[in-house]
UniProtKB/Swiss-Prot annotation:
Monomer. The keyword Ligase applies. Pfam families: Lip_prot_lig_C, LplA-B_cat. The lineage of its organism: Bacteria, Pseudomonadati, Pseudomonadota, Gammaproteobacteria, Enterobacterales. This is Lipoate-protein ligase A. Its main location: cytoplasm. InterPro entries: aa-tRNA-synth_II/BPL/LPL, BPL_LPL_catalytic, Lipoate_ligase_A, Lipoate_protein_ligase_C, LipoylTrfase_LipoateP_Ligase. Gene3D superfamilies: Bira Bifunctional Protein, Domain 2, CO dehydrogenase flavoprotein, C-terminal domain. It comes from the Bacteria. It comes from Escherichia coli (strain ATCC 8739 / DSM 1576 / NBRC 3972 / NCIMB 8545 / WDCM 00012 / Crooks). Keywords: ATP-binding, Cytoplasm, Ligase, Nucleotide-binding. Residues 29-216 form the BPL/LPL catalytic domain. ATP binds at R71, G76, A77, V78, F79, K134. In the transfer reaction, the free carboxyl group of lipoic acid is attached via an amide linkage to the epsilon-amino group of a specific lysine residue of lipoyl domains of lipoate-dependent enzymes. GO terms for biological process: protein modification process.
Length: 338
């Protein structure tokens, strides 16, 4: 029986693909070597320990229907669209070795006519007249008895959108996370005009088979045709949840300030695991009572635009004479934290 397993996803859903990856990684026999090929529609994928409000322009993502997906590996934030090919190599220990999977990808690129090399811990670069350009980035995860290496290859990604979603709004964030480094990148289509996702997948598959001297039939998977993976529904529910994608952010502080016709407002939030642990309000308003009440209501609230807006509008019951001011405040807060 072959020790190899090859899975190719027909789904562009990042939560589905990452849930498949997680399930296979947890449940695979330690003797198995797995290659999983996939790609995501418009998504910002962040590292396990990153703060989405610091890394991403969450407001623009929401406006453009770009999803946020937190992966289980470390590293920085990346933007995925259908111009990216994603790969995941998994193996048990002691056989797991990320240099092997890196060499498989390099061999695949070489077979396609691209001479690339590893750079640093995570990147593959090609040499151009303008200098080295990154075409692939990777991240890794290891447990006691297994490990995986996953990454992306830039085929024909819309590089302008990279900056749209990975450059956050100028919010006053004092975060404990680390802002991702923006690398100089290029698409493989600049070197191989017309190259397709299918061609890249075929090249990686051939290099995978060649390295291990075995072949295996590909398992084509999609939400309508999921592999036999125990607990997949629970894993998908977690992967797609707000609690995982946003709520796992490291602790951070956020200052919002705005001047309205009735006075200036400063809101100071301390946030842990997606919940406001402390809220302070400062204002020169002649009627500070609604804002003081708001500070109390926001303690323990989810740091989510709709929840903050809901708490703000709940004050209308106690302060009906300030309806106009509270509705303006509510709209501003919701927009500021998106």
């Amino acid at each position: 029986m072959s020790t190899l397993r090859l899975l190719i996803s027909d789904s562009y859903d990042p939560w589905f693909n990452l849930a498949v990856e997680e399930c296979i990684f947890r449940q695979m026999p330690a003797t198995q070597r797995v290659l999983f090929l996939w790609r995501n529609a418009d998504t910002v994928v962040i590292g396990r320990a990153q703060n989405p409000w610091k890394e991403c322009n969450t407001r623009r993502m929401e406006e453009d229907n770009v999803r946020l997906a937190r992966r289980s590996s470390g590293g920085g934030a990346v933007f995925h669209d259908l111009g990216n090919t994603c790969f995941t190599f998994m193996a048990g220990k002691p056989e797991y070795d990320k240099t092997i999977s890196t060499s498989i990808v390099l061999n695949a690129l070489n077979a396609l006519g691209v001479s690339a090399e590893a750079s640093g811990r995570n990147d593959l670069v090609v040499k151009t007249a303008e200098g080295d350009r990154k075409v692939s980035g990777s991240a890794y995860r290891e447990t006691k008895d297994r490990g995986f290496h996953h990454g992306t290859l830039l085929l024909n990604a819309d590089l302008s959108r990279l900056a749209n979603y990975l450059n956050p709004d100028k919010k006053k964030l004092a975060a404990k996370g680390i802002t991702s480094v923006r690398s100089r990148v290029t698409n493989l289509t600049e070197l191989l005009p017309g190259i397709t996702h299918e061609q890249v997948c075929e090249a990686i598959t051939k290099a995978f088979f060649a390295h291990y001297g075995e072949r295996v039939e590909a398992e084509i998977i999609s939400p309508d045709k999921t592999p036999d993976l125990p607990n997949f529904a629970e894993t998908f529910a977690r992967q797609s949840s707000w609690e995982w994608n946003f709520g796992q952010a490291p602790a951070f502080s956020h200052l919002l300030d705005e001047r309205f016709s009735w006075g200036g407002v400063e809101l100071h939030f301390d946030v842990e695991k997606g919940h406001i642990t402390r809220a302070q309000v400062f204002t020169d308003s002649l009627n500070p009572a609604p804002l003081e009440a708001l500070a109390g209501r926001l303690q323990g609230c989810l740091y989510r635009a709709d929840m903050l807006q809901q708490e703000c509008e709940a004050l209308l019951v106690d302060f009906p004479d300030q309806e106009k001011e509270l509705r303006k405040l509510s709209t501003w807060i919701a927009g500021a934290v998106r």
